[in-house]
């Protein structure tokens, strides 16, 4: 299992918000931008509107796992920021997965398998 490379700095997130393309579902928003490397990098955010720290961390764990499961099907060389929304922590995993795959198809980052 490969390690997920994280976006760590505020400037990286801001660049993605301003110059990346956004794709939205009822459960989360995904920002995507080419990064010029041969790896994908991930950033996950969950604002205080989602709930207390326990709920925010649960939402982030679910999104991280969703990304991990779909990584083998994704093209390389992109930065992703996934912004959790209120229903992320309570939605069915199958619904999250189908929405995430739909957004990846829209962003044209899924490999042709």
Identify what each model region corresponds to.
Residues 1-113:
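Positively charged, solvent-exposed patches that mediate nucleic-acid binding
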């Amino acid at each position: 299992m490969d390690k997920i490379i994280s976006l760590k700095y505020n400037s990286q997130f801001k660049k993605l918000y301003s110059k990346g393309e956004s794709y939205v579902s009822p459960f989360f928003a995904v920002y995507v931008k080419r990064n010029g490397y041969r790896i994908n990098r991930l950033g996950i955010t969950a604002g205080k509107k989602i709930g207390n720290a326990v709920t925010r961390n649960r939402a982030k764990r679910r999104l991280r796992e969703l990304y991990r499961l779909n990584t083998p099907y994704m093209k390389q060389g992109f930065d992703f920021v996934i912004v959790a929304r209120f229903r992320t922590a309570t939605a069915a995993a199958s619904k999250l997965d189908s929405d995430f795959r739909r957004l990846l198809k829209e962003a044209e980052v899924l490999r042709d398998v």
